[in-house]
């Protein structure tokens, strides 16, 4: 059943050829069989999943629900899930049972989508490899020696290995797109504010954005349709009519102007990645798109700006984890200061502490102007690059990451080389624009993703381009042999 597309599953559920109970049990059996080696789930929720599947079958029998009713989903462990352990990959939240649902979870629950469990991730979404999780590294289903990308590595791995038909992720500097690229799946980071952040544990609030991780662009459109939309509980949620992501999927892309930045093909880009991306651009041209050269001259300023701004926001957001109200608490504190210091130093991992320190430093009185304010200026320059480029084209394409998935442990001792793994994805988060990763081939047996970037609120157009590309390629249908 796991080889069916979500569209086929949906049709079979409606036609009573399969039940949600049988479908959900099939995925739970696969998780039992394979997740021991992948470590893609932090928590599996079989009782909840089966209860929700029974309810979904009743909804379908009564003609209620929607296209995704009865289709199971896995949520990244950054989304609060009522009465389910929600850890954000950290010892700090190892015993935290969420008292409410995040908007993303609430929306899928209301539609009758059984929750299979919570997926593994870099601690507090800080990382590009899913190695910094308190629960151990997740492995890449294409090659168990490789990382799945991060921070949404668990969600990418469960889709690639067929341990869930649909999953959610979050993207602060590339955390949906880079793992999607490394695991050969489709993932979209919507425009900032399109998907509510209510109940999504905060890392860097002006960057964080939730989104779908699926096999195909069509499935991403369906899931985005469920989770997007205005939510008054999130002050940054966009108050505007929701786009129709699905009805334009089959539109012709003849005459579409596709921008290719010269800066994306400079030194440091893996040859195999470059050739796959050029082949994908040629496919778009065959579909009638017009290729135009554009420039993003400030691309290299994005990573330094991001690693001042995001840690600054994190140092503020993570101050709430103090050992007092919830989360990890050290044993036998001598006084309040000792409680704070030891709870935080014992509860947070090395990468999280590194970013809190960098952020606190950037915000300190003597350095605020030199670092934080300067980084804000760079952020505007990077955004303006995109605004100017989109005057000449409709979408921008390039690689998602400079290399295919690297080996587990390869970059863990060198934080800067790990940070540079996100050099193509981070600029988009600085600008707050939508972007997606679409499977586009393999380099040395490991998947490569094509990066599609659009102007604000152009998710429907990006999904349309991706869907058209997937009509003439089958990279998104490939599955690692051991999980077929």
UniProtKB/Swiss-Prot annotation:
Cysteines paired by S-S bonds: none
Domain of life per record: Bacteria
Catalysis performed (reactions): L-glutamyl-tRNA(Gln) + L-glutamine + ATP + H2O = L-glutaminyl-tRNA(Gln) + L-glutamate + ADP + phosphate + H(+)
Gene3D superfamilies in the record: Amidase signature (AS) domain
Pfam family, one: Amidase
EC number(s) stated in the UniProt entry for this protein: 6.3.5.7
Catalytic residue positions: 76, 151, 175
Gene Ontology annotations for the cellular component aspect, listed alphabetically: glutamyl-tRNA(Gln) amidotransferase complex
Any one GO BP annotation for this protein: translation
Alphabetic keyword roster: ATP-binding, Ligase, Nucleotide-binding, Protein biosynthesis
Record-level Gene Ontology MF annotations: ATP binding; glutaminyl-tRNA synthase (glutamine-hydrolyzing) activity
InterPro entries, alphabetized: Amidase, Amidase_CS, Amidase_dom, AS_sf, GatA
Cross-referenced HAMAP family: GatA (MF_00120)
Subunit annotation: Heterotrimer of A, B and C subunits.
Family of this protein: Belongs to the amidase family. GatA subfamily.
Name the record gives this protein: Glutamyl-tRNA(Gln) amidotransferase subunit A
Organism of derivation: Hydrogenovibrio crunogenus (strain DSM 25203 / XCL-2) (Thiomicrospira crunogena)
